[in-house]
């Protein structure tokens, strides 16, 4: 299990990555392919703490865009990040 600091460094250092975390929406642990920067822009993801949870906002490469055309997703308390 990686620390939040290790995960943040990893996503900042790699163009694409696989991030693993528990998704309440699905009720299970999932792994998603993402980037820290929105494609074709300089807009970066964010790492913040919300009510004691470590939250990473990343661009999900394979996600269906939401109604605003966005593919930003929140990984809460991710357990692992690795090269895609």
Where in this protein do the model-derived segments appear?
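Acidic, low-complexity, intrinsically disordered interaction modules
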Residues: 34-50, 65-67
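Residues in well-ordered beta-strands of folded domains
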Residues: 20, 35, 59
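Mixed-charge, Lys/Arg-rich low-complexity intrinsically disordered regions
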Residues: 1-10
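Short, compact, well-ordered microdomains
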Residues: 55-84
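A short, Trp-centered hydrophobic/proline-enriched beta-strand micro-motif
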Residues: 13-21
């Amino acid at each position: 299990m990686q620390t939040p600091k290790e995960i943040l460094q990893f996503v900042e250092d790699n163009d694409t990555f696989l991030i693993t975390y528990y998704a309440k929406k699905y009720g299970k642990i999932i792994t998603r392919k993402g980037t820290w920067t929105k494609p074709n822009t300089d807009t970066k993801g964010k790492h913040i703490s919300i009510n004691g949870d470590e939250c990473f906002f990343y661009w999900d490469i394979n996600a269906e865009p939401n109604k605003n055309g966005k593919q930003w997703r929140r990984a809460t308390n991710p357990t692992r990040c690795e090269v895609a």
